């Protein structure tokens, strides 16, 4: 058996090195599977939000524990955020969705001075973080009954072998080189970085190609991108707030061209003649999936913010990596705010305003960019970005029947002849007096669903289905069966709504032909070395007691070669907490095979 284990060490020390997987961010060559553990809880008596204001998650990266601190980005949306899309027959529909309890966060890694994070917590953790100078991406793995996530370095996402992508801006901001010379000599101190607070109310338009490409995922994809743009501009004391999203579901409102300069001009004309009359905003960015000519992936007018036609930018969605698209948008927005491309004289060869997109993309502004921005504020004094967004920022007075939800209206479904929304009185643009709700898992035809109607099905046999109460449109808080209840025909015990068993963990690590290794494989966990152990205390590996060996390193095999002892060297290759290790026993937090009645 020892000989088999030695062979395994040679073959499987790094089972993910060289392995690949197709994720939402693309084809990833090397990744780790992690199980983020939430280590914060809502205090007793506190109001339970769907998404808490602050959270912490613990997981391991490269075998070392990290704690990810997250804070909700409460400045992501304007107070009057609205969306416009189009019905199948082409009618324009504008709504004002509630976005206060959203799921987009900024954060940092604990004890990492230069760390940042931009994370969506809507369905698992998705986004990016900086750790020890490297950019990591994280996203959930689509495994049954699992909280597994993939963590991988940006460099491990496969990129197409092609010419470097770049911005299409060629115009120069200033008539002389003086601002460039001053900026290149600038040593930016903390005091100098305290730019005056400015507010950019951002409108985003997604064309039909974008909708076809992303479908229902388009909105969260845009929100995640703007969350990253918001974080990037914090260093400049510029608040980027999303005020409006327009999705061209049915057809485009302009005919986008592969020539980026033509598309930018067309979009500017449409913004001036249509969009500004619909919603007040400071800058508009067009997201498109068209392939621009040459290496161009974005374009914008320089020093143009507040200009009715020129305060625009266009961004090509050329990659599935959300962070890259966010950096491109931040770059084009930088042009709107007076920044030129970084030259050789700048103190950063790979910052945001570099003409060529870098790998990984930078989230820093150079000293040149700071100088350009400061000079732009002084020379142009743009008025539209001076003040925070007002509570209601609609330009035209409300008109009942125009299918736009405006000040003083509870609903607007069009004329009485065309109204298809039964909750709304089309004559008054008020909800009918009998209306109990408009939306929600427990709302149906404007009334609360009857008590007992299932609103959230059980994910697993350890989960509990939630039922409507006849008192609210919202589904009750998710709950699950008690920890320790037998599950999967007594092959496991419930733990936090899941049924962790070794077989499924092997499946997640090594594929559908994998199963649990023979008992003799686990005896290696009594060694107490860097490969086989139960705990790590003060940099020392603690061997497993004989009764605890099935709570240390997980051993798997293949159904066609049961004598093989296969294992995963990373932290994800340890037996998961709550896993059954013997009859009536589970692995506790100390990796001891403990009685199921006391383990939790």
UniProtKB/Swiss-Prot annotation:
Tissue specificity note: Expressed by the venom gland.
Residue positions binding Ca(2+): 399, 402, 404, 406, 409, 412
Positions annotated as glycosylated: 261, 317, 425, 467, 513
Gene3D superfamilies: Collagenase (Catalytic Domain), Disintegrin domain
GO cellular component: extracellular region; plasma membrane
Propeptide: 21-191
GO annotation terms (biological process): proteolysis
Disulphide connectivity of cysteines: 306-384, 346-368, 348-351, 400-429, 411-424, 413-419, 423-446, 437-443, 442-468, 455-475, 462-494, 487-499, 506-556, 521-565, 534-544, 551-587, 581-593
The Disintegrin domain, residue ranges: 397-483
Complex formation: Monomer.
Function (record text): This metalloproteinase-disintegrin-like impairs hemostasis in the envenomed animal.
Recorded family membership: Belongs to the venom metalloproteinase (M12B) family. P-III subfamily. P-IIIa sub-subfamily.
Name the UniProt record assigns to this protein: Zinc metalloproteinase-disintegrin-like stejnihagin-B
């Amino acid at each position: 058996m020892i000989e088999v284990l030695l062979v395994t060490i040679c073959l499987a020390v790094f089972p993910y090195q060289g392995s690949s997987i197709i994720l939402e961010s693309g084809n990833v060559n090397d990744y780790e599977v992690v199980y983020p553990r939430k280590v914060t809880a809502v205090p007793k008596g506190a109001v339970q939000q769907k998404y808490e204001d602050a959270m912490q998650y613990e997981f391991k990266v490269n075998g070392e524990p990290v704690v990810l601190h997250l804070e909700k980005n409460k400045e992501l949306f304007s107070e009057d955020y609205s969306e416009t899309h189009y019905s199948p027959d082409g009618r324009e529909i504008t709504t004002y969705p509630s976005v206060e309890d959203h799921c987009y966060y900024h954060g940092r890694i604990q004890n990492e001075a230069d760390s940042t994070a931009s994370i969506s917590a809507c369905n698992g953790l998705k986004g990016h973080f900086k750790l020890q100078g490297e950019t990591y991406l994280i996203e959930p793995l689509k495994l049954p009954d699992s909280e597994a996530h993939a963590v991988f370095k940006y460099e491990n996402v496969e990129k197409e072998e092609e010419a470097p992508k770049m911005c299409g801006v060629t115009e120069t901001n200033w008539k002389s080189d003086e601002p460039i010379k001053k900026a290149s000599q600038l040593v930016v101190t903390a005091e100098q970085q305290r730019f005056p607070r400015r507010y950019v109310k951002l409108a985003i338009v997604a064309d039909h190609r974008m909708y076809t490409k992303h479908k229902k995922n388009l909105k969260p994809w845009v929100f995640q991108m703007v969350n990253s743009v918001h974080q990037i501009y914090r260093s400049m004391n510029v608040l980027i707030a999303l005020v409006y999203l327009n999705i061209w579901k049915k057809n485009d409102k302009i005919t986008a061209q592969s020539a980026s300069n033509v598309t930018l001009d067309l979009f500017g004309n449409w913004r001036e003649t249509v969009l500004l009359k619909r919603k007040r905003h400071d800058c508009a960015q067009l997201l498109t999936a068209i392939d621009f000519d040459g290496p161009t992936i974005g374009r914008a007018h320089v020093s143009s913010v507040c200009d009715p036609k020129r305060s625009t930018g266009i961004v090509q969605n050329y990659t599935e990596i959300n962070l890259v698209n966010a950096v491109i948008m931040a770059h084009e927005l930088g042009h709107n705010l007076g920044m030129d491309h970084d030259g050789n004289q700048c103190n950063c060869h790979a910052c945001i305003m570099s003409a060529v997109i870098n790998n990984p993309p930078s989230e820093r502004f150079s000293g040149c960019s700071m100088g350009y921005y400061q000079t732009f504020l002084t020379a142009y004094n743009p008025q539209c970005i001076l003040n925070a967004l007002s509570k209601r920022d609609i330009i035209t007075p409300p008109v009942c029947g125009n299918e736009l939800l405006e000040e003083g209206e509870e609903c607007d479904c069009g004329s009485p002849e065309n109204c298809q929304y039964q909750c709304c009185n089309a004559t008054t643009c008020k909800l009918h007096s009998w209306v109990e709700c408009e939306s929600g898992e427990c709302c149906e035809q404007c009334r609360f669903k009857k008590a007992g109607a299932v609103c959230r099905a059980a994910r697993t046999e350890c989960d509990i289905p939630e039922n409507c109460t006849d008192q609210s449109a919202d589904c009750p808080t998710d709950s699950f069966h008690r920890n320790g209840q037998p599950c999967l025909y007594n092959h496991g015990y419930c733990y936090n709504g899941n049924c962790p068993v070794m077989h499924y963990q092997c499946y997640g690590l090594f594929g559908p032909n994998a199963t649990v290794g023979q008992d003799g494989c686990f005896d290696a966990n009594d060694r107490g070395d860097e490969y086989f152990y139960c705990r790590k205390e003060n940099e020392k590996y603690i061997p497993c007691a004989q009764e605890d060996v099935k709570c240390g390193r997980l051993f798997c095999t293949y159904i066609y070669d049961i004598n093989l002892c296969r294992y995963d060297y990373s932290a994800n290759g340890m037996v998961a907490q709550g896993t059954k290790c013997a009859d009536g026993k589970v692995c506790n937090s100390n990796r001891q095979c403990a009685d199921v009645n006391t383990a939790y």
